């Protein structure tokens, strides 16, 4: 593996490999925030295009692709099978490897739960300190597990306060901020996002038929962008269409003509893992480049699907089960045609109270 440079998802400007907690420096200066992504030299094999090609740190990855007998035309990628119970372990494994290799002593993140738990676990495994800036409504099980893992937890009422702490820590030479400090947000650290490419590679290897659609819960598009990049880099495959699911129109509003850097009012209800009032350029690009869509699934609808799935023994959190509601609608409206196979990404289990 040879990581060549970082490139902006918006303006395509190139930068040497370094840490940019505000995203693309050029776009940041111009007041139009956008994230960066990793680019490798042409001699690197597609499935080695990762910043750190190492054995799994805690056993993350290789999660099952489930065929449910009652779910016609789709499989479920069960990311709840990761060590701390969510897809965020893939991000944490990669970004903590980077922090350790770069000589940082602490990693810091603004998180609604899953990312903080993942980062705390992988930081502990690497002997690094971890600071998590969370909301005051963070469920007690998450608080307890963060304490068990040795994380420093700080709770705030607003995004601005959470980002303020991460911004302060990012100014310290011993700390790597892995969630961005720009407003509006651009997404998380690009080296961590590379870990999500493995989801695409695993799906391609596990699926018995061509996957034409992938349905993904989303907040700021880290997962969706990583999955898109993973499929796009695989030779001989047509990247599937990505359908990003949100609790109220954010990306959907952008696709209808609203500016990507806007503030979008709405109520996330109990969908804390995909909450937030902004979207990102990387989320928009993932949809546009794949020919996908944005799907709105309310908290009430997620509650209905949560109950249905629990009744069948499935233990995914509410934000995860939004993909089932979105898939049902995509099939009904013909966006996913008869005979086209889809993968629904179930991102986390329900045991954390999220």
List PLM regions with ranges.
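Alpha-helix C-terminal capping segments
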Residues: 97-103, 117-129, 229-234, 325-335
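Small/polar-residue-rich loop-to-helix segments that shape phosphate-bearing ligand pockets
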Residues: 131-210, 268-284
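Phosphate-binding loop/pocket of nucleotide- and phosphate-handling active sites
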Residues: 261-268, 322-354
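A short, small-residue-rich loop immediately preceding and capping a beta-strand
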Residues: 95, 103-122, 126-135, 211-223, ...
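Active-site/ligand-binding loops adjacent to catalytic centers
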Residues: 163-178, 233-318
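N-terminal juxtadomain amphipathic helix
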Residues: 1-65
């Amino acid at each position: 593996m040879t990581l060549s440079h970082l490139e902006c998802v918006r303006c395509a400007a190139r930068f040497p490999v370094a840490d940019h907690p505000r995203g693309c420096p050029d776009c940041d200066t111009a007041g139009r925030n956008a994230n960066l992504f990793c680019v490798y030299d042409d001699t690197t094999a597609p499935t080695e295009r990762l910043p750190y090609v190492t054995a799994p740190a805690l056993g993350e990855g290789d999660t099952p692709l489930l065929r449910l007998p009652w779910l016609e035309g789709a499989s479920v990628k069960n990311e709840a099978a990761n060590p701390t119970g969510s897809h965020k372990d893939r991000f944490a494994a990669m970004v903590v490897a980077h922090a350790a290799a770069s000589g940082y002593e602490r990693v810091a993140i603004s998180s609604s739960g899953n990312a903080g738990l993942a980062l705390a676990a992988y930081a502990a495994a690497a002997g690094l300190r971890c600071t998590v800036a969370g909301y005051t409504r963070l469920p007690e099980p998450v608080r307890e597990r963060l304490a068990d893992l040795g994380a420093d937890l700080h709770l705030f009422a607003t995004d601005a306060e959470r980002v303020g702490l991460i911004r302060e820590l990012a100014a310290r030479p011993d700390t790597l901020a892995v969630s961005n400090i720009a407003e509006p947000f651009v997404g998380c650290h690009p080296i961590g996002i590379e870990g999500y490419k493995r989801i695409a590679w695993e799906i391609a290897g596990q699926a018995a038929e061509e996957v034409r659609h992938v349905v993904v819960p989303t907040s700021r598009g880290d997962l969706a962008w990583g999955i898109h990049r993973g499929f796009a880099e695989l030779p001989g495959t047509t990247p599937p269409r990505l359908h990003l699911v949100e609790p109220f129109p954010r990306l959907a509003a952008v696709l209808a003509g609203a500016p990507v850097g806007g503030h979008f009012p709405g109520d996330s209800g109990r969908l804390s893992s995909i909450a937030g009032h902004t979207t990102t350029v990387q989320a928009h690009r993932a949809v546009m480049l794949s020919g996908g869509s944005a799907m709105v699934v309310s908290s009430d609808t997620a509650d209905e699907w949560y109950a249905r799935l629990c009744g069948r023994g499935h233990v995914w959190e509410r934000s995860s089960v939004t993909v089932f509601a979105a898939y049902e609608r995509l099939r009904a409206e013909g966006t996913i045609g008869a005979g086209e196979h889809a993968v629904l990404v179930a991102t986390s289990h329900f045991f954390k109270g999220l």
